[in-house]
């Protein structure tokens, strides 16, 4: 479900033409390949904000089977035209009414999904980069794994700050031991 939300956010933030090229999904992480030019740090931040906003909204996730002929022309439903579809397709809709085809995200999908976006917990992008010409990859964490990734980042930054403070103290001691003439000679 987080992959569907990411795909929807990419359409809104990067380009409506950003189409899925492949994916890997597990319980607490995902990899999403899509066609696009580079994604800026500001765009990545907006994508995270959108996905986490939909998670916070506690949107229901509906999986319904529909006649392919009835939905194949619906531009609001993400369809992968290289794929072959049978007479009946499964539409996964995040948000909206069960039978309304009015969700935040709607895609043909046969995968496993949660019942509500709140079950994702948290979405955090781990990395984004090129994997081929015109193809980008986003790797992201969800739930407790996302929280752990953030915790590790905070710990690493705290250690960097502590080292910088120690270096400043050392320089202050060195300057205190120097005479005014020596300090001025360092400046000039």
Where would I find each of the regions flagged by the language model?
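Terminal appendage regions of diverse proteins
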Residues: 17-19, 27, 117-122, 126-187
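Active/ligand-binding-proximal structured segments within catalytic/core domains
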Residues: 1-34, 135
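Generic recognition of long tandem-repeat/solenoid scaffolds
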Residues: 32, 92, 138-140
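Histidine-centered divalent metal-coordination motifs
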Residues: 4-7, 113, 188
């Amino acid at each position: 479900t987080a992959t569907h939300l990411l795909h929807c956010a990419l359409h809104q933030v990067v380009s409506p033409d950003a189409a899925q090229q492949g994916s890997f999904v597990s319980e607490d992480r995902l990899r999403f390949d899509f066609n696009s030019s580079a994604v800026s740090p500001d765009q990545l931040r907006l994508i995270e904000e959108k996905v986490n906003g939909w998670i916070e909204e506690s949107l229901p996730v509906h999986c319904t089977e529909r006649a392919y002929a009835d939905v194949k022309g619906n531009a609001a439903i993400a369809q992968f035209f290289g794929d072959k579809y049978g007479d009946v397709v499964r539409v996964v809709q995040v948000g909206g009414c069960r039978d309304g085809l009015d969700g935040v995200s709607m895609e043909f999908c046969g995968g496993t999904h949660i019942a509500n976006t709140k079950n994702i917990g948290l979405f955090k992008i781990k990395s984004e980069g090129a994997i081929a010409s015109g193809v980008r990859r986003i790797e992201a964490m969800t739930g407790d794994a996302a929280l752990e990734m953030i915790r590790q980042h905070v710990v690493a930054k705290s250690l960097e700050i502590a080292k910088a403070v120690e270096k400043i103290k050392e320089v202050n001691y060195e300057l205190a031991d120097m005479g005014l003439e020596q300090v001025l000679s360092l400046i000039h």
